[in-house]
Each structure stands twice: as structure tokens, then as C-alpha cells.
């Protein structure tokens, strides 16, 4: 199917994908006086006396801001705030469809870190959570870090953490299938940007001890001068053997390849140099680092991509609806690392041992069990950690 043409027609026909819908009817004078003036003054007074009452009397508790500056949109790059709108609308649509979370796109006409932080802080009283989206690295790290420190609502950069959570969920099951342990496998992550770094961090929390990050210029190593601050910090805690060189060398002998990089950078011959029962997660979109049939030709046993037309789709839609549903229902002040681990385990657990096979290591995007399971795990974790207010 020609999805480009169909998408253009959809967006033109509907003038976007989302709209504001009323929860109550205003059909007569009494309705008007209750929904607006004079009756509306009473909830205003209650909230003025106790700001936490805003969760009781307004939509804040189920409302998420989808914030972008349009600098890292899909594979399109820095296309600006207006051109980012269809993606942010799409994100809001998925929030609603998969977890009944109301979300609103906010595309900012600035690339300045301080301006973005200040703007989101000004908007925060309206929202129960903030989903950062398609903001380029390394600025995205500072923006998220500061907002998490300065706001008392969940802030979540989905390009980092959503990707990391679903990768970890898939890898937990893939390793179970091939009979290998997280602490023992050798992992190469191609793409040392926001997603690759976040994947590495979460894998380490799951016990991974042997990770090498690779970027365009080669392995991320403490001896390299080209590293940005985020990459340099990762060099200190990964690549313990101080491997150097291009991906073609680094991939040799590895048990796991995780790609969040560019199309067609891996060949069947490269996969053939990996360890036996190799696991290949090639997630570049729309064209992966290696097509599944080529990875299989190279000897990979478990293969996943970011595409819906192949088995084992590694898709963030398995994560962000449920993680925000749980955080909002708990009225959490933040999304902690432990909540991310809980989300990954919940996704992995959807696939039972009896169901687990090479072409089914992760639930499908439309599996209705996923969002509720993630939400419950996240909510339970928030309460156990003392970051819940509900």
C-alpha cells in the first residue's frame, strides 16, 4: 500500500488527527451557569485554597503535553515545529487510543535549551505529565534532566526511555529463548545518540556488564577525542576492554546487536562473525540496519526490527501509553528508573514461556493486554517508592 499517499489524504480530509471533545453537554441556561459562570467560581475557590484539588476538579490529572522543537523528527531530522505537528498529533492520538490519556501537541519555535525549559515550566500547571519528543541530542539530555528536577509531574523523553524499555523487554525474552544470561552476553549498540545511550543505561540496570556503543566515527572509547559529554560519560562505564574501530570490527564475537542508527550498515557477512545464536535488533526506520532475511542468512537466531511488516516489532507504542497511564493514575511526581524496569518486565511477561519463540519475543502493538499491564506495574512501583500522591 502507498502509505505516504494515504497519510496525506487522511491528514487533508480531517485537518489533522485530533480534536477537543466536551465531557459535558451545554444545552440550556442551567448547564451554562454550571459549566461556566457563575458556578465555575466554586471549583476555582477550592483549587485556590489547595492547589492539589486541581486534580479533582479539572482535566489536569489525565492531560499530557507532547513537547517538541522539531529538531530530530523520525528520520527527517531538523524540520522545524510546524512540520513536526503531524508526528506530535499522532502521538496524542496513540495516547488516547491505547490508554485513554488526553494529550496535546506543543511544538516550540526555539532550539534554545533555556527557552524550552522555561516554556515547559510555564505550561506545567495545565498538565499532569510531559512527554518530550523528537528533540535532538545532546540537548535532550539537559532539557529532560532539568525539567525532572524542577517540576513535580512526570517528565519522560520517549525517544530515549520508551525505546530503551521496549528493547529491554524484547531482549529479556530473546535471551531466555537462546539460554544466555544478561550479565554474560556481549552487546554492541550501534548509534550513540539519545536512544542508544538510554538503551545502554537501562540494560546495565538489568545487569548487562559487557556493552560497547558505536557511532559514526567508531567505538565509544575513553581514548577518543570526538565524544560529546553524554558519550564521554558512557565511555567511562561501558567498553571495559577499550575496543576501538568501526562496527565491522566491533560486531565480531558479540552475542547481541542493537541498532538505532542508519539503514543498511550491517551485512549478512558481519552477522556471521557474531557469536552463535546471535540476537539482532535492527531498528532504524523505515529501513533497518539489516533486513531480517539478510540477518537470518548471516546466522542470526532472533531478529527484531522497528517495522510492522516483520515479526518482533520493537515499537514504543508498547510503552508510553501504559507508563503515563500508570504514572497519572498514581499521580506520580516522576517516572523513576525502577518504574522503567517494572514497565519492561511487564511487557516481557505478556509473552508466556509456552508462547515464546524466535518470531514472537514481544507482544504486538495491538495487544490490548499491554497498556493495562504496564500501567499497573508502574502504579504499583510508584506507590512502593513513595512517589505516588494518589
Model features per residue range: what roles?
Residues 1-155, 375, 381, 385-389:
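N-terminal ligand-binding/catalytic initiation module
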Residues 105, 131-134, 155-158, 189, ...:
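General beta-strand structural signal in soluble alpha/beta enzymes
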Residues 158-159, 181, 282-390:
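Adenosine-phosphate binding glycine-rich loop
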Residues 69-71, 79, 108-109, 134-137, ...:
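Short, ordered loop/turn segments at secondary-structure junctions
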Residues 74, 81-99, 157, 161, ...:
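Glycine-rich phosphate/diphosphate-binding loop of Rossmann-like nucleotide-binding domains
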Residues 232-301, 307-309:
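Rossmann-like adenosine-cofactor binding region
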Residues 12, 55-60, 96-97, 122-124, ...:
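Solvent-exposed alpha-helices and their adjacent loops that cap or buttress functional pockets
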